[in-house]
Amino acid sequence: MVETEEFIAEAKAEIREAIGDANAVIALSGGVDSSVAATLAYEAVGDQLTPVYVDTGLMRKGETEEIRETFSFMESLRVIEAQERFFDRLAGVTDPEEKRHVIGEGFIDEFETVANDVGADYLVQGTIYPDRIESEGNIKSHHNVGGLPDIVDFEGIVEPVRDLYKDEVREVARALGLEEVISERMPFPGPGLAVRIVGEVTPEKAAVAREATHVVEEELEEYDPWQAFAAVLGKATGVKGDNRVHGWVVAVRSVESRDGMTARAQELDWSTLQRIQSRITGENENVARVVYDVTHKPPATIEYE
């Protein structure tokens, strides 16, 4: 396990040494990884840092409002409304790796716009160790690693938590005094809901994935999963009232894990599963059926794409 106080001191020193007297921007998503990286960087270089939150339209329910409130102490925080730009970029894209790269390039473009505005030379990211392992092993790229364009107009990229596992990042978050809503938050992928949508990403699919994931997180809180969410797989036939419908198939996934490198699907009570499907199909008329994913990692990955 990580020695938090020692790590925090070393990370801040590393950030100060890397950035020097220059300015930097940081990708702030609201997840524990980027939140820890942002807090470390903010405490290290203060007003030289501009935290950038990009609302891609692929975020969790209520995420943007929560970010504004939680990080209001960072006066330099910028919230970028980029939903339309990201959906335009993703139109017609169905390959999982291409989606990740498109999103990665979109993030960098947004950051570069702010960086040019504030004269930033460095990009800070919340990349953690499992991200790098999966990218280097070609299991899947991560938007903050493999999704970077070949040419980036930053002098350098700083990744203060790059050698930590998820549970270690949480320890650091607690030591930094971050709120529980951040330190204990379930992992959320950098590309957002895009990796929970099989095939083309559209505003409709994103809305279904967002609302269904909110239901899953609420209903499974007592199970204390490492990660729990809903994914939109495709369409199938169903019945609503007396009418035959062709609606979305939503997969529910809930896993136990220490660090995300391996994971086991949780055994959930039948009544819990029925309550989840009832809420998801009842609250969204475009959902025809709900299934539960029992696959461990390996052979599956935790996310769908």
Curated annotation (Swiss-Prot):
Cellular component GO terms, alphabetical: cytosol
Record-listed ATP binding positions: 29-35
HAMAP family: GMP_synthase_B
Source organism (scientific name): Halorubrum lacusprofundi (strain ATCC 49239 / DSM 5036 / JCM 8891 / ACAM 34)
Catalytic activity: XMP + L-glutamine + ATP + H2O = GMP + L-glutamate + AMP + diphosphate + 2 H(+)
Keyword terms, alphabetized: ATP-binding, GMP biosynthesis, Ligase, Nucleotide-binding, Purine biosynthesis
Known function: Catalyzes the synthesis of GMP from XMP.
Biological pathway: Purine metabolism; GMP biosynthesis; GMP from XMP (L-Gln route): step 1/1
Gene name tied to this protein: guaAB
PANTHER family with a match to the protein in the record: GMP SYNTHASE [GLUTAMINE-HYDROLYZING], GMP SYNTHASE-RELATED
Domain of life: Archaea
Signal sequence coordinates: none
GO molecular function annotation: ATP binding; GMP synthase activity
Residues of the GMPS ATP-PPase domain: 2-185
Statement: the UniProt record of this protein carries the keyword Nucleotide-binding: yes
Enzyme Commission identifier(s): 6.3.5.2
Designated name of the protein: GMP synthase [glutamine-hydrolyzing] subunit B
Enzyme kind, highest EC tier: ligase
